[in-house]
């Protein structure tokens, strides 16, 4: 019974706290929200305001990227007109192939036409016959065979 005597005072304090006094600084969460659309509008406005305050870093980075990669750079070597632009290693490969063919034709000038037309297979069994020099870098001496 002791607890029932305190019940009306607790109920009075609870009801007093629930009263919405406009002059007090307590927030009233459900007083102005008529529907959920107002909350969505406020969230969108807050998001837009935060985006508009940020610096324009993305645009600056994009402008720097375009400026850097759109400039024409002066080539280090003279460019031949009429040829499409090619990677320098591809030019080097063409030069190496030309050099290989030149050495092949110089070596071939020492050989006679009879060397290519002979049908004696026993003479060529003792020594290997290469059109180009071997891949391991050694030069063949036909005199030592």
Swiss-Prot record:
Biological process, per Gene Ontology: neuropeptide signaling pathway
Q: Where in the cell is it found?
A: Secreted
Annotated family: Belongs to the NmU family.
Role according to the record: Implicated in the regulation of circadian rhythms through autocrine and/or paracrine actions.
| InterPro entries noted in UniProt | Neuromedin-U_amidation-site, NmS
Lineage start: Eukaryota, Metazoa, Chordata, Craniata, Vertebrata
Which residues comprise the propeptide?
26-64, 65-100, 101-103, 139-145
UniProt cross-references to PROSITE patterns, sorted A to Z: NMU
Q: Where is the signal peptide?
A: 1-25
Q: Which organism is it from?
A: Bos taurus
- Keywords per UniProt: Amidation, Cleavage on pair of basic residues, Neuropeptide, Secreted, Signal
Protein name according to UniProt: Neuromedin-S
- GO cellular component assignments: extracellular region
Where is the PTM Asparagine amide found along the chain? 136
């Amino acid at each position: 019974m002791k607890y029932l005597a305190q019940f009306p005072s607790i109920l009075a304090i609870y009801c007093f706290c629930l009263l919405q006094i406009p002059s007090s600084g307590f927030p009233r969460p459900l007083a102005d929200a008529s529907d959920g659309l107002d909350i969505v509008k406020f969230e969108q406005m807050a998001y837009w305001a935060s985006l508009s305050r940020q610096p324009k870093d993305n645009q600056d980075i994009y402008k720097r990227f375009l400026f850097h990669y759109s400039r024409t750079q002066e080539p280090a070597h003279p460019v031949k007109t009429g040829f499409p632009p090619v990677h320098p290693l591809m030019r080097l490969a063409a030069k190496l192939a030309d050099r290989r063919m030149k050495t092949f034709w110089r070596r071939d000038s020492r050989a006679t036409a009879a060397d290519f037309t002979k049908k004696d297979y026993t003479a060529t069994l003792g020594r290997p016959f290469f059109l180009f020099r071997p891949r391991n870098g050694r030069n063949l001496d036909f005199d030592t065979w």
